A protein has these predicted regions:
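Glycoside hydrolase catalytic-domain context in secreted enzymes
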Residues: 1-388, 394-410, 427-819
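Short beta-strand elements
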Residues: 412-428
């Protein structure tokens, strides 16, 4: 076997490469498509290029490109909203305010850096000091009348930073507007300046009061976090060069208290060791829509500069699902635009209890000129039309009538058709899981739901809505094709089960050896004797997280290390010195929009293109496995890593992850690692929290996205999560790793742990990871090696298990490293 070889990753050239330019433009395109227009009163947008703009708010000049931790990208540079507007010729009249904020920000960053470096001296893991002290955007000085002179329109940018290791806080300046933000916005309102409010945050910020109590906030845009060229992307939308077409992927509540089980999330109830998912299947819009709780902005919502008409054109049924046809026409007169057609279904209501509607499929049009139309075909998988029965341990397509709704958000739907299933059909008989929860789920009042169900049935009858007979057929399982390794002595295979031990301990992926800043590597212990080459991994999911630059000693050819902190924040926390007689290598990766922003495009073809671009950079920097995409459910808006994830909906999450996977893995030698499997829905005490989830909620909500991604795109790897699930660490869970992933879904790739899951005293047990089907412990340490060796010698870790797990690992290594 020929393997990939190189001397040093990156290039000595500091100049921007053609690849950087090309992928930067793709990042900008994805950013444009992910911007969501939430309000546009008096059609204030798009702006006239001659409009004099007063630009304010923390994110105006310091726009947040993405979240912190492993989801960050150390790219070359970023274009802020201020820069984007200036490059487009917009006259900014608030330069003094912006310059003053620049100095405030610089001082806040300096003080924050000093605090991190000081606290890092007294902790075993420097990343803990970083995670416990997330940087908060400082407040600027108050906006005054002097700052608004000549301003014809105000743009106010609310920015938030969140990241790995800590959940967002329910305080002013985080989930709520800060006191200064409120005062500034109210001041602009009192000045009667038409205002555009920009939300530059990885998740919702509560806006209800400020929107209801002011008169001059004419427009609101949720831009999420748009990567390195977000400022240009937003300018293109504000000026009408691009018509906004993004849609929300999570519900924005009027009040935090409106979210299900809101007061019991994470740290709020004081029980960080146990998280009870009492809401069951009623997450996000499933709760709001089912029980009539009005949100501020609903799931799937997003406005445009033009008007679109959606007409249902018919439906076809087959044993494996349904195909809906819908025609979209741009009925506007001025702007071209795109539309997302969303199809929802209502399942038969019975004693099992179901949500009122669920997203069943979607498609996005091409760019339609005024008067232009397009016919879309939207496929609905049979399992999307089923529910999971805990009593029968099966997915069941239930006898009865199903409503099919078509529109462009959960709040804007038309009853289009009715499906009839003559007899109940078991689609998939599942394995009985060993670990179940003992929690009692919330019991919600379903009286209104029954009335609404009756109402749509009457409407279908009175309006003679088309009725289609659907005969679902059972799923055929894909058998796992894993083969054991039978040639190499079993004891020599043991190092495969933990990463290439580098002596670096971090919950952040920074244990790479051959590519500076890479997350880690599989073992090199079998290379000399058996030619087994180690795989190199890099964090994601907004691009590759590598060290931006590094030095190599010219005489010894050794790389100067910078430590875990040095790999963060584009090297801002680096303390290393510049060395004499050393060459500097550069690794400039592209910072794409965060996962949420990509999902807000609702454009699978575009996400696949982003995946191809990521793979191109993997090839350039010798990365075999990308530790992405992340597709945990956005269960609560306070989760610190929601920005990495796609949606509160499992279908949308899984479909986006599948598109990204297809893109990356279309390039030979490039693989993804879908994560975090499963229920990694909070960051506080993420390594010790026990997620208590009913099997139905687990399968319908929290595992469904993984199932879609595995079956549609065949990712080569899965990463298990830190948390316990119903009493067992995910990396030690036979239910997750073997019973579900391998035996039910036919997953034949490798499952690896998240970083240092075995390090805590009550963490995952190394040898039990292997027996559960979690093949590799990352990044690996001496204690892992000793625990596995002893378990093998004692017979707790059998030779059969060793050979089967090794077979999966060696197959992956061969697939990704052979040329």
């Amino acid at each position: 076997m020929t393997v990939k070889k190189w001397k040093h990753s990156g290039t000595k050239k500091h100049s921007m490469s053609d690849r950087e330019i090309r992928n930067g433009l793709l990042s900008e395109k994805a950013a444009e498509e992910g911007i969501v227009l939430l309000k546009n009163d008096k059609k204030i947008l798009p702006l006239n290029i001659s409009t004099k703009i007063g630009l304010y708010g923390a994110g105006a000049g310091k726009t947040v490109k993405g979240g912190t931790g492993s989801g960050d990208v150390n790219n070359r540079s970023n274009i802020s909203i201020y820069q984007g507007l200036k490059e487009n010729g917009i006259q900014i009249v608030s330069e003094k305010w912006l310059a003053n904020y620049e100095s405030i920000y610089a001082e806040a960053r300096r003080a924050w850096k000093e605090k991190i470096l000081e606290e890092a001296k007294f902790v075993e893991n420097p990343f803990d000091a970083y995670a416990e002290n997330p940087f908060a955007m400082p407040e600027g000085r108050a906006v005054t009348a002097e700052d608004t002179v000549d301003a014809q329109t105000a743009i106010y940018v609310v920015s938030r930073i969140s990241g790995e290791g800590k959940d967002r806080r329910r305080v002013e300046g985080d989930y709520y507007l800060s006191r200064r933000e409120q005062e500034d916005i109210r001041f602009l309102d009192a000045q009667k300046i038409p205002t555009v409010l920009i939300l530059n945050s990885g998740g919702p910020v509560e806006l209800t009061d400020i929107l209801e109590e002011t008169e001059n906030i004419y427009a609101v845009l949720n831009i999420s976090q748009l990567g390195q060229r977000g400022g240009l992307a937003l300018a293109n939308v504000l000026l009408g060069k691009v018509t906004p077409g993004g849609k929300l992927t999570a519900t924005w509540a009027r009040r935090y208290e409106d979210y299900p089980c809101a007061e019991e999330y994470s740290y709020l109830n004081g029980k960080l060791e146990r998280e009870e998912y009492k809401e069951g299947i009623y997450t996000g819009y499933r709760y709001f829509d089912t029980f009539g709780v009005k949100p501020l902005f609903p799931f799937g919502y997003g406005l445009s500069y033009t008007e679109m008409q959606i007409r249902f054109h018919g439906m076809k049924t087959s044993g494996d699902g349904v195909e809906v046809e819908a025609e979209v026409t741009n009925t506007g007169e001025t702007f071209s635009g795109k539309e997302v057609v969303q199809v929802y279904v209502s399942l038969p209501q019975d004693e099992s209890g179901k949500e009122y509607r669920r997203l069943a499929g979607f498609a996005k049009t091409k760019l339609l000129k005024p008067g232009e139309k397009e016919l879309l075909k939207i496929r609905i998988d049979r399992k999307t039309l089923a529910y999971f029965s805990e009593e029968q341990h099966a997915w069941i397509a239930e006898k009865g009538y199903y409503a099919v709704w078509v529109g462009n958000s959960i709040a804007s739907l038309t009853l289009a058709a009715m499906l009839e299933v003559p007899e109940s059909v078991i689609l998939d008989k599942t394995n009985i899981l060993e670990n179940q929860t003992d929690i009692t789920e919330e019991v919600y009042d379903r009286q209104n739901l029954s009335a609404r169900t009756l109402k749509w049935k009457e409407k279908a009858e009175n309006e003679k809505i088309g009725r289609y007979i659907y005969y679902p057929e059972p799923e055929k399982r894909t058998e796992c094709t894993c083969q054991p390794e039978n040639k190499i002595p079993a004891k020599d295979l043991l190092p495969l089960f933990y990463g290439n031990i580098a002596g670096i301990s971090s919950n952040l992926g920074a244990a790479g050896i051959r590519v500076p800043g890479s997350a880690g590597e599989t073992t090199a212990a079998l290379y000399e004797q058996y030619g087994v080459f180690p795989l190199i991994m890099a964090d994601g999911p907004a691009g590759l997280r590598l060290q931006q630059n590094y030095e190599v000693d010219r005489e010894t050819d050794t790389v100067y290390g910078i430590g875990v902190l040095g790999s963060l924040e584009n090297g801002y926390l680096r303390t290393d010195e510049i060395h004499e007689n050393a060459d500097r290598y550069y690794q400039f990766c592209t910072a794409f929009p965060v996962g949420t922003a990509l999902a807000q495009t609702w454009d699978t073809a575009l996400v696949e293109k982003v995946g191809i671009a990521v793979a191109e950079e993997m090839e350039e920097f010798h990365i075999d496995l990308w530790l992405a995409p992340g597709l945990n459910i956005q269960r609560n808006p306070l989760c610190g890593r929601n920005f990495e994830y796609y949606s509160e909906d499992p279908l949308l999450s899984g479909t986006m992850a599948a598109a990204m996977t297809k893109g990356v893995q279309s390039r030979p030698g490039c693989g993804v690692t879908v994560k975090h499997f499963a229920c990694n829905n909070q960051e506080d005490n993420r390594m010790g929290v026990d997620a208590q989830v009913s099997e139905r909620a687990l399968r319908e909500i929290y595992l469904r996205g993984f199932e879609i991604a595995v079956k549609e795109s065949r990712p080569v790897a899965i990463m298990s999560s830190y948390n316990l699930l119903n009493g067992v660490h995910a990396a030690n869970s036979v239910d997750l790793c073997t019973a579900i992933a391998r035996k039910e879904w036919g997953f034949d790739g490798v499952i690896m742990s998240d970083w240092n899951t075995t390090v805590p005293e009550d963490g995952s047990i190394p040898w039990k990871c292997v027996t559960a089907g979690n093949d590799i412990i990352m990044p690996g340490n001496a204690a892992d090696a000793e625990n596995i060796r002893k378990a093998f010698e004692d017979g707790k870790l059998s030779e059969e298990v060793v050979r089967m797990s090794a077979g999966r690992i060696l197959n992956l290594i061969h697939t990704l490293t052979a040329e």
